């Protein structure tokens, strides 16, 4: 399993496209974006107070205050915003400042109004010293010209959009959403809207959930439909999808039964072909990974629960990789103690669904065909390949479903 996670790295990446900020949330930048100019662009006050030369306040205290001549005020309002203050702070002088006001020339700090008082007309008393830069945001403190604002490969967050907007960047080059075609296979599979089921039929639950997971990972799900258990029908469907797909997902048919045709068909689609067929994971052992004519292909088990577990661990990273995401957001996780022993076999990675209450993780068990185990779970615990189980009371990391 570790080899599959680290070793299967298809070269395909979606191209870049320009995206206005209004539609850029969670999109993946195709190139770093740098600041076109300094931010905020001017030195400004972070407090209400007085702009001063810091050296004029050295040594002052409650018992030995200093006195400065009040020579003017920086104002805020539609008339003065956008213009430089026509005031210079000279030695022994101070200028009244509002929060956000442009620092006048000559000043290198702002003393908070709480540490001053006006003792007579044109004179203020200062009882606390300030250091250079105190109470001030430098002209390039948020970003210097040419500094990186957002990196390539990390999905854009709301705060990233705020930084770009502050810099006047209104369009970002982002990777196009990878088109992920999702096929279901099996004569027994019918659409979810089927009102009644004949004996042996099942509604296509996997395709609905897989499409949702593709969208969560930043992809564009494309329904491939339900393909019968007939190799030539599957081959025709896959060949038809290859030119318009960045990734193909095949639900069911990857096992070794007489009606499981995925591996044989994928071998004929194009080079380099199958990378691996069978992964040391439970559930999901018969998973297939391939690359055909530059398009990654993932074949999943037929049981919906197994398919969704494997796709979360292998398929979601593939969707992100093809979509240029090299810095995926961290999965939410909590630490909890196991409520009971978890047996496992060395050499196999086990994914165990759990409920978490009061810092205790209770394992949920059931047949791999049961979706109710997934819907009841708060998250999952991974038993690593080198372990032979985990004892009750062991502290584990639980990956929480979003």
Predicted regions and their residues:
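Phosphate-interaction motifs
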Residues: 1-170
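Flexible glycine/proline-rich
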Residues: 16-17, 21-22, 31, 44, ...
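Short beta-strand segments
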Residues: 53, 96-98, 127, 151, ...
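Short glycine-rich anion-binding loops that position phosphate/pyrophosphate groups of nucleotides
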Residues: 57, 100-101, 187-188, 253-259, ...
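N-terminal small/polar loop signature for handling phosphorylated ligands or for N-terminal nucleophile
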Residues: 74-91, 110, 211-270
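Short glycine-rich, flexible loops that bind phosphorylated cofactors or substrates
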Residues: 104, 158, 256-258, 306
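Phosphate-binding glycine-rich loops and their immediate beta-loop-alpha structural context
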Residues: 135-250
């Amino acid at each position: 399993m570790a080899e599959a996670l680290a070793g299967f790295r298809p070269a395909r990446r979606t191209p870049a496209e320009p995206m206005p900020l209004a539609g850029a949330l969670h999109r993946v930048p195709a190139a770093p974006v740098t600041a076109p100019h300094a931010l905020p662009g001017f030195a400004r006050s972070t407090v209400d107070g007085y702009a001063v030369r810091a050296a004029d306040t050295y040594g002052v205290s409650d018992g030995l205050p200093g006195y400065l001549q009040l020579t003017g005020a920086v104002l805020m309002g539609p008339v003065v915003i956008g213009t430089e203050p026509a005031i210079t702070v000279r030695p022994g002088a101070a200028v009244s400042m509002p929060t956000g006001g442009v620092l006048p020339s000559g000043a290198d700090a702002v003393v908070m109004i709480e540490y001053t008082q006006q003792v007579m007309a044109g004179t203020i008393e200062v009882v606390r010293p300030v250091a250079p830069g105190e109470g001030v945001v430098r002209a390039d403190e948020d970003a210097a010209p040419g500094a990186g604002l957002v990196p390539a490969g990390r999905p854009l967050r709301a705060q990233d959009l705020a930084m770009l907007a502050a810099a006047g960047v209104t369009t970002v080059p982002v990777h196009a959403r990878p088109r992920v075609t999702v096929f279901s296979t099996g004569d027994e599979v019918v659409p979810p809207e089927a009102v009644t089921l004949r004996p042996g039929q099942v509604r296509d639950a996997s395709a609905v959930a897989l499409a949702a997971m593709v969208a969560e990972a930043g992809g564009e799900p494309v329904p491939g439909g339900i393909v019968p258990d007939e190799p030539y029908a599957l081959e025709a469907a896959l060949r038809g999808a290859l030119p318009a797909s960045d990734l193909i997902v095949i639900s069911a048919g990857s096992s070794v039964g007489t009606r499981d045709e995925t591996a044989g068909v994928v071998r004929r689609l194009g080079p380099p072909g199958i990378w691996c067929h069978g992964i040391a994971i439970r559930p999901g052992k018969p998973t297939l990974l391939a690359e055909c004519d530059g398009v990654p292909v993932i074949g999943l088990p037929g049981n919906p629960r197994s398919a969704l577990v494997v796709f979360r661990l292998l398929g979601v990273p593939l969707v992100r990789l093809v979509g240029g995401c090299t810095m995926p957001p961290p999965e939410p996780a909590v630490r909890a103690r196991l409520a009971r022993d978890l047996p496992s076999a060395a050499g196999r990675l086990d994914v165990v669904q759990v409920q978490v209450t009061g810092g205790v993780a209770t394992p949920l068990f059931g047949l791999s065909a049961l979706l109710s185990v997934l819907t009841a779970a708060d998250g999952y615990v991974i038993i690593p390949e080198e372990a032979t189980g985990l004892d009750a009371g062991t502290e584990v990391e639980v990956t929480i479903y979003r």
